[in-house]
Amino acid sequence: MSMVTNTGGPAQTTLLTRPFLIVTATAMVFFVYIGMLIPIVPLFIEGPLGLGEFGIGLTIAVFAASAIIARPMLGRLADRYGRRVLLVGGASVAGLAGIASSQVTEFWQLLVMRGIMGVGEAAVFVGAATLIADLSPRDRRAEGASYFSVAVFGGIGIGPIFGEFLLDDTQFERAFAAAGAFALLAAVVALFAPARVAPLDTVDETIASAAPASGRRKIMHPAAVMPGVVLASGVAAFSTFGAFIPDYSREVGLATSGGLFAAYSLTSVLVRIFGATLPERLGPRRAVTIALGTLMIGLAILAIVPTVAALWVASIFVGIGMAFNYPSLLALTVNRASDSDRAWAISSFTMFFEVGSVFGGLFIGGFAQVVGKQTGFFGGVVCCLVGLYLLRFKLVPAGSPDSGPSYQTAMTQAPVAAD
């Protein structure tokens, strides 16, 4: 497999190369699988398995916890054997678990399958996100992450529509098997992805953390911690939307939730396509403030206004919020790490997707079990407020070199005052 190299500065570098498109195609197909399971799993738990909100939350937590446990190993595997092995192996494992879920009859069996799916999803995401960072010039990483996330959110948006259609209220065996087939298809597409990519930029390796290469440093890259905590706040908030909407929308009066997920995903995709350069232009402080603020508004609408119209409006706000939440935080993490640490830093950062899911699944799920789904959306509002505080006062306070549009060069140049 030939290496991808850069022949010019950032202005001459083509971002949307063939390897870039292959990685995004892999992610697109794989996240159709993830999206299909969004309505299928909660309805399966509350239907054939006869459990409630806490059961839904527990499956989210198991999925996330297994991914968290696997993350440190996945980063090392990516550095040692290349990124492609994570894409192919992760998608294959997740696909087989999805197909096996079609034969589940007990809740504990579903928990085992969700745990295996979590490991597979983590492998695919670490491999794909690392390749996207490898393939993006330093000053265009947030833009690259925006385009990549179009595939992620496009798949998540299309998946629930397929899932609800194949489910047809009761056909769980067919729906699980079809979802697993999409993951296996993603593994086939991933065979054409590059295993490794030569650095596009010359980066000062002294950026790496001064922490010793043992103990906590092997598990968590320091550059990922605070961006990851802010990310986790948004993910925990969003988990209320993903977990509660399938059943709550039926309570309010919609026949299915597929359209709501499509509205959220389409909004997010459009923002990321037509506003792909906005994260770089705004800087992480402004971009992530928009993300958490609009996500909070959407969840507050769901908690306060129990109408069909409110569901659609809230879905659009959630889509805007999720469009801005991830790219700037990922780019900030990668730009604070050395090239040799990139897979480790991304593995550490993306671990916080699962940290947020665990918190949202267990604590907000338990809260909703007591107060009901509608009031449970307020748990997501609180998570957004926590994330905003950490972002604006801890991660990128006013005046920080990283707070404005010039943050992408802050680690290699003298500090520049924020706009």
Identify what each model region corresponds to:
Residues 50, 82, 103-108, 283, ...:
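Helix-breaking motifs and short loop linkers at transmembrane-helix boundaries and internal kinks
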Residues 3-17, 195-228, 407-416:
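Juxtamembrane intracellular "pre-TM" segments in multi-pass secondary transporters
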Residues 64-72, 156-157, 265-273, 357-358:
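Residue-level signature of mid-helix packing/kink "hotspots" within the transmembrane helices
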Residues 70-82, 271-284, 368-369:
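Helix-to-loop junctions at the C-terminal end of transmembrane segments
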Residues 108-116, 298, 309-317:
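Paired small-residue
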Residues 69-105:
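Conserved MFS/SLC helix-loop-helix module at the cytosolic interface between two early adjacent transmembrane helices
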Residues 113-152:
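Cytoplasmic helix-loop-helix junction between adjacent transmembrane helices
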Residues 85-99, 180, 286-300:
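Structural signature of the two symmetry-related core transmembrane helices
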